[in-house]
Amino acid sequence: MPDTLLGGLRILITQADDFMGPTLCEVLAEHGADVIASRESLTDPTAPAAVVTAAGRVDVLIANLAVPAPSTEAVSISDDEWRSTFAALVDPLPRLVRAVLPSMIERKSGRILVMGSATALRGMRRTATYGAARAAQIGYVLSAALEAAQHNVQINAIAQNFVENPTYYPVEVQAKPRFQEFMKREVPLGRLVSAREDAEFAAYLCSKAAACFVGQVFPVAGGWAIR
């Protein structure tokens, strides 16, 4: 029997080759979604609107934004590092929403899910730039969601860390004994959340069964974010 959890939904996933993109595309399609995988860079101010226009009708937008995380101490962060990180992670988000939200409001139906980071919820050394950018995403979600909810459009975010993905936790990082020791010591789950586990949760949030969530930020980090 075919899986119809997301049947009939057109879901646009940005940066589909990065971060959670590959697994999201696979899992959401398995659940019956018509997946539109965008691989364009979104740093050009005109790119987000162009991507949304090219996609046609979008029932669900998954803002899957990623950039290699800088590991600079706060005292040494350059203006270039700060600006380029925000240009990749923060600036495209309101541009995407501006492009996709009007049609959702008109239809009185839609979902926007931001694939964020738990570094916005709990600090880590040498992640001040990255954590600040991810926190800006969450701040935007919290306010924009309140405005969209009155039109039956839900905006939420997954704040993840220690989840399998090719951008931040590639296989070569996972194989390092030092990293494995860190996981056992610092992450209550004792392992990485699998990419599929994360994507299955995203699929639920995109479904009609999750229509009650407004401006929610869901930590998916093996217990690390709540310690």
What spans do the regions from the language model cover?
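Canonical Rossmann dinucleotide-binding motif of NAD(H)/NADP(H)-dependent dehydrogenases/reductases
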Residues: 2-36
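A glycine/serine/threonine-rich, flexible loop-to-helix segment
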Residues: 150, 162-186
